[in-house]
Design a protein with these regions (language model features):
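Conserved beta-strand hairpin/beta-sheet module of binuclear metal-dependent hydrolase folds
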Residues: 1-45
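Structured catalytic core of nucleotide-sugar glycosyltransferases
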Residues: 7-17, 59-64, 79, 90, ...
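Active-site metal-binding motif and surrounding structural segment of the metallo-beta-lactamase
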Residues: 36-81, 85
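Single, functionally critical "micro-switch" positions that shape active/binding sites
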Residues: 29, 58, 123
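Short glycine/proline-enriched coil/turn segments at helix->beta-strand junctions
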Residues: 23-25, 74-77, 95-97, 113
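Beta-strand->loop->alpha-helix junctions that form or flank phosphate-binding loops
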Residues: 10, 54, 101-105
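A generic hydrophobic-helix recognition signal that picks specific residues
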Residues: 23, 52-54, 117
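Metallo-beta-lactamase
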Residues: 83-125
C-alpha cells in the first residue's frame, strides 16, 4: 500500500485547508485562506501550489473558499465540488470565478493518479 500523508494547514473559522500527498498525487481540500498563505504553508511541508493536482471543496462557506479563485485561476489547479455548492458559490452563471471546474453529485468518487477521493455526507457545526 502506498504511503498517504495528510497535513492540516489551516483549521477554524478564519480558514480551512488540508494538504494530502500520495506517491504521485498532491491535493488540497478547501482553500479557506489566501493563496499566499496556502503557498507559504505548503513550502513549510515541502510542497508548493505548482505541485497540486486538484483542489476539492467541501462546501461553499467563505472559511473554505477564501483563496479558491486565485488558486484555481492563477495556479491552474482544477477544482472539484458538488453541484449544490457550485450553485451557492457561483451566483452569476456567466462568471468565470474558477478555471477548470468539475461538478459532482453530493456523493462521488474521483481517481487522480493512484489516489481515489470519495465524498461522504457529514453534518456541519
Amino acid at each position: 500500500m502506498d504511503k498517504l500523508s495528510a497535513y492540516t494547514l489551516f483549521s477554524g473559522s478564519s480558514g480551512n485547508c488540508v494538504y494530502i500527498k500520495s506517491a504521485d498525487t498532491e491535493l488540497l481540500i478547501d482553500a479557506g485562506v489566501s493563496a499566499r498563505a496556502v503557498e507559504k504553508a505548503l513550502r513549510e511541508v515541502g510542497s508548493s501550489l505548482d505541485r497540486i493536482t486538484a483542489n476539492f471543496l467541501t462546501h461553499e462557506h467563505v472559511d473554505h473558499t477564501r483563496g479558491l479563485e486565485i488558486i484555481s485561476k492563477k495556479h491552474h489547479i482544477p477544482t472539484h465540488m458538488t453541484e449544490p455548492s457550485a450553485r451557492a458559490l457561483i451566483t452569476d452563471p456567466h462568471a468565470s470565478l474558477l478555471g477548470d471546474l468539475y461538478l459532482h453529485p453530493v456523493l462521488f468518487s474521483v481517481r487522480l493518479g493512484n489516489t481515489t477521493v470519495r465524498s461522504f455526507a457529514t453534518p456541519h457545526d
